[in-house]
Amino acid sequence: MPMLFSDSLFNSLTIITAILYVSGAGLVAVNMLNNTIVNKQRQLVLASALAAAFMHTLLVLHSYNINQMIANDFFSMLSLVFLVISLLFIATAFSQPVETLAIIVFPFSAIAVLLNIGNSIPATTNVNLDSALQVHIILSIVSYSLLSVAAFQAIFVSIQEKQLHDRHPGRFIGRLPSLQLMETLLFRVLSVGLALLTLALATGFIFLDDIFAQHIAHKTVLSILAWLVFATLLWGRHSLGWRGQKAVKWTYGGYFSLMLAYFGSKFVLQLVLNQS
């Protein structure tokens, strides 16, 4: 069982990674309260984000190196998802002014990392994952991560629109990109996320022997429901001009269904019923 890090080093790196994530969120919070130069803010936040993501990647690689496959326990999977979310955020931040999202994304990433303290040897799985099935898993993780970013984005759109309608936008809102840009980014992320979710479902139907088998039937049904919600939202956007709170509510609905599909049963089995 090869290990990249000892238990103590793994735990130390976990704490350092969480501190880096929180530092990035703290920089955004401080700069939103002060009149700090935007370029300086972006540089500091991105530097902290890159350092945190690098450390986070090492921790995930350590978990992968144990079993030579993606760790299947709840906390390891949660950490992997938030690593992908953080990487997607960083990639977007280099081309779009979305660094304010760090104030929500990074604290969740820090929590996901900290929940793995003492989990340097993640649980094994008895399922034989061939390369085709691993493609399905990777597509599922990336699509879920992208749609998680969309859910975070929807929170900001909701807050921004409500404060603008009240005609008393605070300093927080003043530091955000325009509402039009925020909505445009939201629907771009939703479009790519839905495309990847479509591929994830398609590969599941192709590569899984029985995608409606008892132990994964709920995941399939909830994922299809999420797909229908997101597809309807994008149709409503292009055909009926849906935006604002309607778009936010549909995003929340689709994401809630997808969250139950990905983590609902795993949470109940591993943390409530204490089963592997």
Predicted regions and their residues:
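Hydrophobic transmembrane alpha-helical segments in integral membrane proteins
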Residues: 1-21, 143-147
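Structural signature of hydrophobic alpha-helical transmembrane segments
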Residues: 9-20, 69-82, 215-226
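Cytoplasmic-side transmembrane-helix entry/capping segments in multi-pass membrane proteins
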Residues: 40-49, 75-76, 99-110, 246-253
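A generic, lipid-embedded transmembrane alpha helix
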Residues: 47-63, 113-117
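Hydrophobic alpha-helical segments and helix pairs
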Residues: 93-142
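Membrane-interface interhelical connector segments
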Residues: 160-182
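Interfacial loop-to-transmembrane junctions
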Residues: 236-257
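Juxtamembrane boundary at the C-terminal end of a transmembrane helix
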Residues: 261-276
